[in-house]
């Protein structure tokens, strides 16, 4: 037994709602959740944190911009369910074309274990990276979130440059395994 409350939820590879609670809390510390514009970038097919966050943000009428390598898009079942419920989901293939409009950029890693070989993984993993140059000219209050573990998706120089934009590393707010 534990002397502190424990929240444990999820279904393995599909959802990670306890991480979403932390993400919503982090965003809410900086801005209201209602109607925000959120970019979901990375492995949206297998990234269970992105699945849960998309569902949660739909409750706040957020506009979701999805950006992922081919084959790692947000699952159709999630996209269909959310759009049928009124959530605006806009697919993009270039983060630089929309980043200035975003309130939040949620970056997930490309999961190496999902690829048959290293060459395939590196080809996809190198398709995007958050750099200081990419973030120049964004909203002053843009929040960049990453659920961890972080690989090379965010240039370490960007972490040193924060804020602005505020790059939140969840390890400061009790990470969720």
What are the roles of these predicted feature ranges?
Residues 6-9, 16, 40, 91, ...:
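General beta-strand structural signal in soluble alpha/beta enzymes
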Residues 1-28, 151-154:
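Phosphate/diphosphate ligand-binding glycine-rich loop within oxidoreductases
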Residues 5, 63, 141-143:
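Proline-centered loop/turn at the N-terminus of a beta-strand
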